[in-house]
C-alpha cells in the first residue's frame, strides 16, 4: 500500500510562510555554521530559493514569520548537557547575541539576517518571533502568533532541514496545523550515519501534508493574489 498524499490547498487569510534560522551563521559565507551546509546549498539552490519564497509571500500579502535562533551570555550558565548538535552549536559558536535587550553588535554578526533578505524581513510587517533555543518552536511564540492570526496552513523552510525545520514541522502538526514543506529550500549536513537532507526529505514525506519544490510553492502562493 502506498503512502497517502493528503495535499494542501492554500487559502487567503488562513496561510502563512514560516522560515527558521534565517541568519548569517547558517546562510552567509563566513558564517560560523556555513561550512556545514554549503554543499547542500549548492545542490539545492537553498539560499536563492529562500529568497524566492520570501518575495512570493510578500507579493501575495501572506504573513511571514521568522523563527530565529539566539544565544545570550546567560545561556552559558546552562548546566544540563545538550545533545550532539546543540553541543556543536556551542562549540562553533553560532547565533551569539550580547543580550535580549540590546542590539549592540548585532548588525552584520552571525545572528543577524543576511543583507539580501532584510528588505523583506525588516519591512515592519514580518513577524520576528522570540528565539527558539534548541530546535523546535516549543520555546518561542510561533504557535501563539499563528493562532492570533487565525492561520491554519503553513509553508515551512529553512537551512537546517532535519534539525530545526523538521522540529518546527513536528510541533505544528502536534497542534493541528496543515503543513507544506519546500524540499529545495532546506539544507543539511551529514554524519557517519548518512545525509541530513535526505533524512529530512524522508521524514517530510512521512509527516507533512505536502512536499513541494520552490517552483511549486511560489506558484501556489502567487495564485492566492489572483
What spans do the regions from the language model cover?
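A short alpha/beta connector and helix-capping loop motif
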Residues: 13, 31-57, 61-68
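Short, well-ordered beta-to-alpha junction loops that form the rim of enzyme active sites
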Residues: 67-70, 159
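Short catalytic/ligand-binding loop motif for oxyanion handling, primarily in non-cytosolic enzymes
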Residues: 72-76
Amino acid at each position: 500500500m502506498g503512502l497517502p498524499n493528503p495535499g494542501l490547498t492554500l487559502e487567503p487569510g488562513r496561510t502563512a510562510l514560516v522560515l527558521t534560522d534565517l541568519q548569517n551563521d547558517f546562510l552567509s559565507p563566513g558564517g560560523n555554521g556555513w561550512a556545514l551546509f554549503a554543499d547542500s546549498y549548492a545542490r539545492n539552490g537553498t539560499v536563492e530559493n529562500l529568497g524566492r519564497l520570501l518575495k512570493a509571500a510578500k507579493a501575495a500579502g501572506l504573513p511571514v514569520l521568522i523563527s530565529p535562533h539566539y544565544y545570550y551570555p546567560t545561556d552559558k550558565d546552562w548546566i544540563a548537557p545538550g545533545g550532539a548538535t546543540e553541543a556543536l552549536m556551542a562549540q562553533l559558536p553560532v547565533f551569539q547575541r550580547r543580550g535580549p535587550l540590546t542590539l549592540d553588535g548585532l548588525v552584520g554578526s552571525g545572528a543577524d539576517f543576511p543583507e539580501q533578505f532584510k528588505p523583506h524581513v525588516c519591512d515592519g510587517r514580518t513577524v520576528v518571533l522570540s528565539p527558539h533555543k534548541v530546535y523546535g518552536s516549543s520555546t518561542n511564540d510561533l504557535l501563539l502568533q499563528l493562532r492570533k492570526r487565525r492561520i491554519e496552513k503553513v509553508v515551512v523552510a529553512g537551512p537546517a532541514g532535519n534539525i530545526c525545520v523538521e522540529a518546527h514541522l513536528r510541533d505544528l502538526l502536534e497542534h493541528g496545523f496543515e503543513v507544506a514543506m519546500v524540499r529545495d529550500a532546506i539544507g543539511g549536513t551529514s554524519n557517519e550515519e548518512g545525509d541530513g537532507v535526505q533524512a529530512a526529505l524522508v521524514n517530510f514525506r512521512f509527516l507533512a501534508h505536502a512536499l513541494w519544490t520552490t517552483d511549486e510553492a511560489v506558484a501556489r502562493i502567487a495564485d492566492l493574489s489572483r
